[in-house]
């Protein structure tokens, strides 16, 4: 079985971005700038933010973290977003989710300028994705597509099944897989809680993407031998970190599969860095 190593792939991308940034520094006059907003003390969110800061440092991107208390008001948060929208040295704004109770995350996401929405969650960027127009793509599904391309695994002309329909992963991933292109162009089925026979749908997949948010939901009897399996889930259990798929069993029959951890997670951050550099190039007018 081919291990789809997101950790190694992401490291290679960071190295490439570092060279890209270094080459454009003189023309741009400054490094790319990413603002990260963290509200509250959620431990998982703090880990994610530290990982993003570390990734920025390795890629030559200047990151600026804004850590706000859990009792921050909606107005205060929106004022900060407005300030960052107006700063010339900030190319991307990332709002770490989830937000504490009482804060409207959708309102905040819509407040971020679409031109600085490097997470790809603004309705304008989601709409542009649906219409096949240029724009920032949500980082997790875009990272998945980048991983497939790096391993030269093309779903073109194949049956792709996406388990999960969230706005963050499932919906945009289905759109990306069904779009024209060498590393897309698949026939896509989206499964969810209303799917009558999930196992049967999964067994039809040449490419199976699982983003259901349920640990070990997909088992080996639900996977076609020789399929490519991408596990987007990650869960902390008594046995350690697991995904939405039973890795040990499925890896025996799949042609290729992502591990958990070390698969999709690092690619999500890599795609965030890619989006930030793209924004920097566009905003500073440098070529490439």
From Swiss-Prot:
This is Bifunctional protein FolD. Its EC number is 1.5.1.5, 3.5.4.9. It comes from Nitratidesulfovibrio vulgaris (strain DSM 19637 / Miyazaki F). SUPFAM superfamilies: Aminoacid dehydrogenase-like, N-terminal domain, NAD(P)-binding Rossmann-fold domains. Pathway: One-carbon metabolism; tetrahydrofolate interconversion. Signal peptide: none annotated. NCBIfam families: PRK10792.1 (NF008058), PRK14184.1 (NF010781), PRK14186.1 (NF010783). The keyword Metal-binding does not apply. One of its GO terms (biological process) is purine nucleotide biosynthetic process. The keyword Glycoprotein does not apply. HAMAP family: THF_DHG_CYH. Catalyzes the oxidation of 5,10-methylenetetrahydrofolate to 5,10-methenyltetrahydrofolate and then the hydrolysis of 5,10-methenyltetrahydrofolate to 10-formyltetrahydrofolate. Keywords: Amino-acid biosynthesis, Histidine biosynthesis, Hydrolase, Methionine biosynthesis, Multifunctional enzyme, NADP, One-carbon metabolism, Oxidoreductase, Purine biosynthesis. Homodimer. It catalyses: (6R)-5,10-methylene-5,6,7,8-tetrahydrofolate + NADP(+) = (6R)-5,10-methenyltetrahydrofolate + NADPH; (6R)-5,10-methenyltetrahydrofolate + H2O = (6R)-10-formyltetrahydrofolate + H(+). GO terms for molecular function: methenyltetrahydrofolate cyclohydrolase activity; methylenetetrahydrofolate dehydrogenase (NADP+) activity. Belongs to the tetrahydrofolate dehydrogenase/cyclohydrolase family. One of its GO terms (cellular component) is cytosol. NADP(+) binds at residues 164-166, 193, 234.
